[in-house]
């Protein structure tokens, strides 16, 4: 009997963390995406004169939605340790700016497509993939958000659009630079791309 209780306790201990996570990552990501959609649909932010205000609102949401440090670490992978602490900090800032510059205009081109969140898949104890689909007249676009649990909050560290991972895409680009050049060369490249050279 005692052995049975021990086994049941262990099973409950293994099951509870997964059960406790159910629903929360999806709801968290959906909440952020809904806020983005609210900004994009706001009539007061439609005029060209409100473009900066719209971008500022979107940036504020992305800062809560994404873990840009984790995203940066995963993008550089083993090359992350080649950067000094100061270089790591600057890289995160520059990479964040690059992503904002690259994707904000694409997001602002939104034309009232419907976004449906379908399910979440547990990847590890602290990482989950939240799956969604953008419904357009021309077809469906699958978008998966990979999130990690940090400080009791689910934050996005990668986005997979139609099977293409944002992290893997940039990792291959940065790997080519770091394969034969020092970290400072990568940082200088990013400075030029975001206009901070």
Which residue stretches match the model-derived regions?
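A mature extracytoplasmic/lumenal domain signature
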Residues: 95, 119-121, 134-136, 147-149, ...
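Bacterial N-terminal signal peptides that target proteins for export
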Residues: 1-8
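Surface-exposed, charged secondary-structure patches
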Residues: 101-141, 193-197
């Amino acid at each position: 009997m005692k052995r049975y209780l021990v086994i049941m306790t262990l099973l409950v201990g293994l099951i509870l963390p997964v059960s406790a996570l159910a629903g929360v990552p999806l709801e968290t990501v959906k909440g952020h995406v809904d806020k983005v959609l609210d900004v994009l649909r706001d009539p007061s932010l439609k005029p060209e004169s409100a473009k900066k205000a719209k971008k500022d609102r979107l940036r504020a949401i992305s800062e809560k939605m994404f873990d840009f440090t984790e995203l940066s670490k995963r993008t550089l992978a083993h090359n992350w340790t080649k950067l000094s602490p100061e270089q790591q900090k600057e890289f995160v800032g520059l990479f964040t700016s690059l992503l904002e510059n690259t994707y904000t205009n694409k997001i602002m081109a939104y034309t009232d497509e419907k976004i449906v969140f379908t399910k979440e898949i547990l990847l590890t104890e602290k990482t989950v993939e939240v799956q969604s689909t953008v419904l357009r007249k021309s077809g469906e676009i699958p978008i998966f958000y990979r999130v990690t649990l940090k400080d009791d909050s689910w934050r996005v560290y990668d986005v997979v659009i139609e099977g293409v991972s944002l992290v893997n895409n940039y990792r291959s680009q940065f790997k080519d630079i770091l394969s034969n050049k020092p970290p400072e060369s990568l940082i200088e490249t990013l400075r030029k791309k975001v206009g901070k050279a």
